[in-house]
Amino acid sequence: MNINMKDNFKKWLDLQQKKTLLKFLTCGSVDDGKSTLIGRLLHDTKQIYDDQLFFLKSDSKRHGTQGNEIDLALVVDGLQSEREQGITIDVAYRYFSTNKRKFIIADTPGHEQYTRNMATGASTCDLSILLVDARKGLSEQTYRHSFISTLLGIKYLIVAINKMDLVNYKQEIFENIKKDFLIFSKKLANDLNIIFIPMSALLGENIVFKTKLMPWYQGVTLLSFLETIKIKNSISSEELRFPVQYINRPNSDFRGYSGILLSGRMHVGQTIKILPENINSRVSRIVTFDKELKKAEIGESITVVLKDEIDINRGDFFVNIDSILQPSQEAIIDIVWMTDNILLAGESYNVKLSGKKIRVYIKEILFKLDVNTLKKVKSHSLVLNSIGRVKIYFSKPVIFDNYSENRMTGNMIFIDLLTNITVGAGMIVNSLDKKGKIPSNKQKDFESDFYDLIIRHFPHWNIPKILMKKVYK
C-alpha cells in the first residue's frame, strides 16, 4: 500500500468515526412492506454489492413475489422459512452508511406471536418506522407496535404510509390515515415526535429520491429525515452512571474499576460518590486498553483509578457527588414475557441489571395489558408474548433508575433459574423504597440463599413458593 492510499484510507476512517450513529427499526402489519423498504434503502444508497445483486436475482426467481423483477425484501428476509412464507420472523439487523450518518436497522416481525422479537429489536433503537398500508389504513398491529415502541422508550415515530401507488397517490387517503393516527397517539406517551411520509417502497418513491407523483406533499424524503434528525437524550443521560463490571488488579501497584460509562461524563480530578456505600472519592486516572484519557464520554469502555483505597465490588455504581440516587429493594416494572412457561406471582428468577446478576421474587401481577386496545386487564399470570405490570422484590438492595429517565440503567432481563434461558425483559416504572440505603438483614440473606439451594438442587420438593412467601413476606 503506497503513501497516498494510506493517507486516503486514514481520512476515510476519520470521516467514519466523526459520523453520528442512528439506530432505528421498522415495524407494522404483516406484508406492509417492511423488508422491501429496507431493501430499497440499501439498494438506492448503493449498499448492495454486485455479487449480492447476482444472488438476489437468483433468489428472487425462486422465492420472490415480484415476477421477473428483483424482490428487495429478500435482502433482509434471511431465514429459509421467511423466504418460503414471504414473511419476517426473526429480527434482521443491517448496517449502512451515507455521507452524513451511519445507521443500524432492525427489521422486526409483524406477527403477534413474534412480539418478543419486536421488543428485542426496539430495546436498543432511537427511532421507529411504522409501516401502514395505504389501502388498509391503521390496523391492530399498528397500534400494538406503536405502543411497544413507546413502552421501550422510543420517542421518535415515522408513520410511513406505504403503497401510495396502489391508491393513485390520493392526498385524501394520506390525510385520513394521518388524522386517525394522531387521535390514537393521544393514548401513548405525551412527549412523542411524529412525522408522516407518503411513499412507495416498491417503486422507491419518497424513500431516497423525491417523487413528482405526489406534488401535494411538501415534506422531506425518508432518508433525508433520517440523516438530519437530532435525537435528544433524556434528562438523566447527563447524570453520571458508571456500574463497575470488573475489578482490574493486574499487579499490586494498580487497582482499577472497569466498565462502560452508561450516561453522563467523567474527568480526571472529579469527585464522585460510590453506591451503595455512599462513600466519596476522587478520580485520579482514566485508562483504556491503549492510552490514558483526561475525560470520558457516554458509551466508552474505561478503567477508573480512584485516589482512595476503597472496598468496591462488581455492581457498585459511580455517580455524581450530588446525586440523590439510592439503593432500593422493591420496584414496579413493565415486563414483556418471552417464554412458554407461564409467569406467576410467587415465582423467582435471576435478573441481570446493569451488569449485575441478582435474584428477584414476583410479589404481584398488577395487570396484563391488551396491546391491541391498550386496556388494562386483571390477570394472575402472563403467557408468551404478554405484556404486563408486576411488583418485584430484589434479594438485596440494588441501584437503578426509572426506565423513562435512563434506559441503560432502568432495564433488566429475566433468567430462568434452572435453564439459564432468558425468559423476559423488564422496564422499571418506579422504586417502592423511598428511605435510602437499606440495612443488611443476615437472617433474610440466609433464607434467600437457602431457597436458592432448594430451587436449584431439589425442585421436585414442590415447596419453593411457600418458602419464598416466608423469605420475602
UniProtKB/Swiss-Prot annotation:
GO terms for molecular function: ATP binding; GTP binding; GTPase activity; sulfate adenylyltransferase (ATP) activity. GTP binds at residues 28-35, 107-111, 162-165. Residues 86-90 are annotated as: G2. Residues 28-35 are annotated as: G1. GO terms for biological process: hydrogen sulfide biosynthetic process; sulfate assimilation. It holds the Pfam family GTP_EFTU. Residues 19-238 form the tr-type G domain. Residues 107-110 are annotated as: G3. It catalyses: sulfate + ATP + H(+) = adenosine 5'-phosphosulfate + diphosphate. Residues 162-165 are annotated as: G4. Gene3D superfamilies: P-loop containing nucleotide triphosphate hydrolases, Translation factors. It comes from the Bacteria. Its EC number is 2.7.7.4. Pathway: Sulfur metabolism; hydrogen sulfide biosynthesis; sulfite from sulfate: step 1/3. PROSITE patterns: G_TR_1 (PS00301), G_TR_2 (PS51722). The keyword 4Fe-4S does not apply. Residues 200-202 are annotated as: G5. Disulfide bonds: none annotated. SUPFAM superfamilies: EF-Tu/eEF-1alpha/eIF2-gamma C-terminal domain (SSF50465), P-loop containing nucleoside triphosphate hydrolases (SSF52540), Translation proteins (SSF50447). Keywords: ATP-binding, GTP-binding, Nucleotide-binding, Nucleotidyltransferase, Transferase. PANTHER family: TRANSLATION FACTOR (PTHR23115). Heterodimer composed of CysD, the smaller subunit, and CysN. With CysD forms the ATP sulfurylase (ATPS) that catalyzes the adenylation of sulfate producing adenosine 5'-phosphosulfate (APS) and diphosphate, the first enzymatic step in sulfur assimilation pathway. APS synthesis involves the formation of a high-energy phosphoric-sulfuric acid anhydride bond driven by GTP hydrolysis by CysN coupled to ATP hydrolysis by CysD. Belongs to the TRAFAC class translation factor GTPase superfamily. Classic translation factor GTPase family. CysN/NodQ subfamily. This is Sulfate adenylyltransferase subunit 1.
